[in-house]
């Protein structure tokens, strides 16, 4: 594992290093964050139904791998790693009324890349921060980080013309 992942093999040895999810939600939205990759694997709107009211099918913005978030990491030992393939350690806390999910990709006990998701009460907007600590000896700082974010949107209404009319 050390041979393939270098310093980030540390994250693969943690108890959270499994294909599992952490849920963070409020009254209007529910998110499932993947431990592998640290990205949003599912996003469901709790107060909106697909097709017609009473159908019971909630609008799912993200599901079935239709979204991808990845940062390409160039290491000092000439490895190219993708965050989507690495395990993050989740920590869910509350700060006041806000829920904060910290997803850390660790190269050691005190060195990491962190994705932080912040969900406020009754709010559809999600705060998202990326920060690092202690990675200057691990990452090649002469090369820029490439952020890749893709989303293939689902059709949530039966009529595509209706959906296009109210979507921008």
Task: Name what the model sees in each region.
Residues 1-168:
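Soluble non-transmembrane domains of integral membrane proteins
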């Amino acid at each position: 594992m050390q041979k393939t992942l270098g310093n980030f093999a540390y994250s693969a040895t943690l108890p959270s290093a499994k294909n599992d999810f952490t849920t963070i939600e409020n009254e209007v939205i529910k998110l499932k964050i993947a431990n592998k990759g640290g990205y949003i694997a599912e996003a469901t709107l709790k107060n909106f139904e697909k097709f017609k009211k009473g159908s019971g099918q909630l609008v799912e913005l993200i599901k079935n791998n239709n979204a991808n978030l990845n940062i390409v990491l160039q290491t000092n030992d000439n490895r190219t790693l993708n965050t989507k393939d690495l395990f993050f350690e989740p920590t869910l806390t509350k700060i006041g009324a806000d829920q904060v999910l910290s997803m850390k990709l660790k190269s050691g006990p005190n060195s990491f890349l962190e994705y932080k998701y912040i969900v406020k009460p009754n709010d559809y907007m999600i705060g998202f921060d990326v920060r690092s600590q202690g990675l200057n000896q691990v990452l090649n700082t002469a090369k820029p980080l490439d952020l890749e974010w893709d989303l293939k949107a689902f059709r949530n209404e039966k009529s595509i013309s209706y959906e296009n009319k109210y979507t921008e």
